[in-house]
């Protein structure tokens, strides 16, 4: 694929009492759109936000060779803050001042490693905005996440703690 620039919209959501989470990503490639989604149990909101970004970047890395420049749009201040905290976290070996591992250390390290393959422009968008042409994809990933969390929460049995990936191609 000759395309070297793409835009990705990500979101994550979690039912805090049940610890059931979902993540979604929309990858825009020229006139094509790829949707990635997944659900996870025993998780947190921040882990879902991170997972959405990681799964999207992993997809790009494995399925879209030649893509280097990524415009990554998220409403997560947590995700947006990670690039600028990288040096400090690495210098502290990903531990807190008390010597404990930082929250989500596994996913943070995975995100940093994946980020090395790309030039990523992390863009913060306000959550839950009214629909306009600029934010339709942010609304789409938000709705996908909330729907999956509701569906998982309504089921009495959640089958696996592993993330389940599904891909929809086209519009």
Which ranges hold each PLM region?
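RNase H-like nuclease fold core
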Residues: 1-47, 51, 58-61, 83, ...
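RNase H catalytic domain
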Residues: 13-19, 54-137
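Short, surface-exposed recognition loops or helix-turn segments adjacent to catalytic cores
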Residues: 124-129, 156-163
């Amino acid at each position: 694929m000759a395309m070297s620039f793409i835009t990705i919209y990500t979101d994550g959501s979690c039912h805090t009492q049940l610890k059931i989470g979902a993540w979604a990503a929309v990858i825009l490639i020229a006139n094509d759109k790829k949707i990635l989604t997944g659900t996870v149990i025993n998780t947190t909101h921040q882990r879902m936000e991170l997972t959405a970004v990681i799964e999207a970047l992993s997809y790009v890395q494995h399925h879209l060779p030649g893509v280097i420049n990524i415009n990554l749009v998220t409403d997560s201040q947590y995700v947006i803050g990670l690039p600028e905290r990288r040096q400090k976290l690495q210098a502290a070996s990903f531990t807190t001042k008390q010597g404990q591992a930082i929250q989500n250390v596994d996913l943070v390290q995975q995100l940093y490693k994946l980020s090395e393959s790309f030039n990523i422009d992390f863009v913060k968008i306000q959550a839950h905005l009214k629909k306009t042409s600029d934010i339709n994809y942010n609304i789409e990933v938000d709705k996908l996440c909330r729907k999956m969390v509701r569906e998982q929460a309504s089921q009495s049995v959640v089958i696996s703690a592993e993330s389940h990936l599904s891909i929809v191609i086209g519009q």
